[in-house]
Structure formats: C-alpha cells, structure tokens
Regions:
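Charged, gly/pro-rich, cysteine-poor intrinsically disordered low-complexity regions
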Residues: 2, 18-19, 26
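Gly-rich Lys/Arg/Thr-decorated short loops/hinges at beta-loop-alpha junctions or inter-strand turns
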Residues: 1-13
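Glycine-/charge-enriched secondary-structure boundary and capping motifs
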Residues: 8-11, 21-23, 29-142
Length: 142
C-alpha cells in the first residue's frame, strides 16, 4: 500500500520461537506482579497500542520513537512485540527476565498523569485521540 509516500510491504512474519519466548516472559512477569499493564502490538502497530493503553487507564504518555522512520515505528505490525508499563522498582527484574529468554527490549518513555499522547513527532489530547478512535463506529452503524 502507498500512503503519504510511504510504501508498505508484506505482512509481518511470525517467528514462533520469538512468540513463545515473549509469552514466557509475560507470564512470569505477570505472576511476579512486575507489570502494571501490557498490550500486544498488532493491529495498527505501536501508535494504536499506546493509544489503547492510554484510553484504558485515562493516562497520557511521552515516548521517543526507535529508528529513523516514524511511520515504520508507529505503524509497523511486526509480530512478537508487546508494550509493557511497570513501576521503576520492577525494571531491573523485568529486564533480567527478558535477557534470560533472549527477548529484546526498547525503553520507549513514560506514562504521565497529564492526558496527552506525546509520540515525539506528534502530540494529541487524550479525549481528542479517543474521539478520533471511536468515530468510525457510529459512522459504520449509520
């Protein structure tokens, strides 16, 4: 697909070993009470994952996107990825779990009490983003 000059590619490949390792890390982290929230990165990529997580908690966030291409960072639907929020006191233990299973980690940013979704390249108010996210539902129902 071509959108705003960015050419998309093939659907993401599923690497079962990576999925299995991520699942093991997430189960252990949940069992140990390390995570405050977790959300798979799938439909819509990182942008939708972060927004849905913010909507659920009525919180904001401030992130720095990895890589050089914001479009890829925000909308890639690569498999075997999750966004996790956790207290600072749990970070080292969570990183150790990931390292033990060979699960790569990218620290993106922080959750904020301010209701702003700050993607680094774009910021939206929480209510504005939620309204845009919900808008297709009434339109589809007529």
């Amino acid at each position: 697909a071509l959108n705003d000059g960015h050419l998309g590619g093939m659907p993401p490949a599923v690497v079962l070993d990576a999925e299995k390792a991520l699942a093991k890390v997430m189960r252990k982290a949940a069992k140990r009470g390390l995570v405050s929230s977790a959300h798979d990165v799938s439909e819509g990529g990182l942008a939708v994952t972060l927004a849905e997580s913010a909507f659920r908690g009525n919180l904001g966030f401030r992130v720095s996107l990895p890589g050089d291409d914001a479009t890829v960072a925000l909308f890639s639907e690569s498999a075997a990825r999750a966004v996790v929020s956790l207290p600072e006191a749990s970070v080292d233990e969570f990183l150790a779990l990931c390292a033990k299973r060979g699960v790569p980690v990218t620290r993106l940013g922080e959750v904020t009490a301010e209701p702003v979704l700050d993607f680094g390249v774009l910021s939206l108010g929480l209510d504005e983003a939620r309204d845009a996210w919900l808008a297709p539902i009434p339109a589809a129902l007529g």
